[in-house]
Amino acid sequence: MRFKGLDLNLLVVLDALLTARNLTAAASSINLSQPAMSAAVARLRNYFNDELFTMSGRERVLTPRAETLAPAVRGALLHIQCSIISWDPFNPAQSDRRFRIILSDFATLVFFEKVVERVAREAPAVSFELRPLDNDPDELLRRGDVDFVILPEFFMSSAHPRAALFDETFVCVGCPTNKQLPRQLTFERYVSMKHIAFRVGGAQMPSIEEQFLLEHGLKRRVEIVVQAFSMIPPMVSGTARIATMPFRLVQHFKKTFPLRIIELPRPLPTFTEAVQWPTLHNSDPASIWMRQIMLQEASRM
């Protein structure tokens, strides 16, 4: 099938190639033989009058033309999938859908475990692929590479729809045996102590609590940066370090680690944990069902 001289089947080939940036991997992802893939690439290069890829050492690099084509091609294929190809009616009890979700260990431990338990009862064949926080979840949503992102709204873009799940507050914690900890810390004492800091996906942007401190002209002394909240309690235990964590997560970890909440002269900020999904999934019955489950479970917290 051709549209204005372009074999539309080649769009699938081009998307696979732009995603994998490797002929063998791209061919495998769409079940093409290596010779068929090479022939398709030659036709694409001829149509666009562009090499599409160049070699930089051992790395295959997109040409400027290919960089421009990548989001347009993926968007076109997603639109066809979500808006033109008709969906089968979604039956949770019979579905084997796998949802790909980016979320933190905080969201997993205090919220998503309940979602998993409920889904296991209502839709036993539905499964999840839980992925760690990423530096650019917006791009993954745009490409349709994930179904949901669960994050504080502070980190979300306005490019995709979202819904608030629950509000949470940060608290400062330390080890109960740390004799340097007074009942209440001044902000000056708080920023001077050794901190364990959580950063979203290793991003350079300030975290919520760091943004709060910057607004008050303060900068804390960070000794250790971690990418999972679950790494904090063992690194606080038996030390003079302190950390800033979501309150519900502190309550969770207090069952297994000695943690003491330390008062500050002013409460640390409250944030809203939210769920975001690709715009093209707005009308996807499976996505709608999953969103309803999450919102219902969040309302019970």
Swiss-Prot record:
Pfam family, one: HTH_1
GO MF terms, alphabetically ordered: DNA binding; DNA-binding transcription factor activity
DNA-binding region ranges: 23-43
Domain of life of the native organism: Bacteria
Annotated ranges, domain HTH lysR-type: 6-63
This protein's UniProt keywords: Activator, DNA-binding, Nodulation, Repressor, Transcription, Transcription regulation
Matches recorded under PROSITE patterns: HTH_LYSR
UniProt-listed Gene3D superfamilies: Periplasmic binding protein-like II (3.40.190.10), Winged helix-like DNA-binding domain superfamily/Winged helix DNA-binding domain (1.10.10.10)
Function field: NodD regulates the expression of the nodABCFE genes which encode other nodulation proteins. NodD is also a negative regulator of its own expression. Binds flavonoids as inducers.
Family designation: Belongs to the LysR transcriptional regulatory family.
Protein name: Nodulation protein D 3
